[in-house]
Amino acid sequence: METVQELIPLAKEMMAQKRKGKMVKLYVLGSVLALFGVVLGLMETVCSPFTAARRLRDQEAAVAELQAALERQALQKQALQEKGKQQDTVLGGRALSNRQHAS
């Protein structure tokens, strides 16, 4: 059934057979569902590039946020290490001065 023109005679023939009226309803239901499927597929095809671009932007934003968090964490760690070195220097100087006085 390549064209719609072939469907019309088929529907008339099926309507002529009174016992198979349920089959006509079934074919009509199937045709309507197939048409909805085609329309939804076309909509998805048309809208797909926009959703893909949005996902890509969201992913890039998440990566940038993660990198910023890692940089902040590295700076905090570096600041703590420098503070620890300063305290070690101060404590080391006190220990040397105590030794000099004790001798």
Swiss-Prot record:
Annotated Pfam families: G0-G1_switch_2
Tissue specificity annotation: Widely expressed with highest levels in peripheral blood, skeletal muscle and heart, followed by kidney and liver.
Entry keyword annotation includes Mitochondrion: yes
Extent of the signal sequence: none
Conditions for induction: Induced by TNF through the activation of the NFKB pathway.
Annotated phenotype, changing F36A: No effect on BCL2-binding
InterPro entries hit by this protein: G0S2
Phenotype when changing V39A: No effect on BCL2-binding
One of the record's GO cellular component terms: lipid droplet
GO terms of biological process kind: extrinsic apoptotic signaling pathway; positive regulation of cold-induced thermogenesis; positive regulation of extrinsic apoptotic signaling pathway
Highest taxon of source: Eukaryota
PANTHER family for the chain: G0/G1 SWITCH PROTEIN 2, G0_G1 SWITCH PROTEIN 2
Protein name (record): G0/G1 switch protein 2
Provenance organism: Homo sapiens (Human)
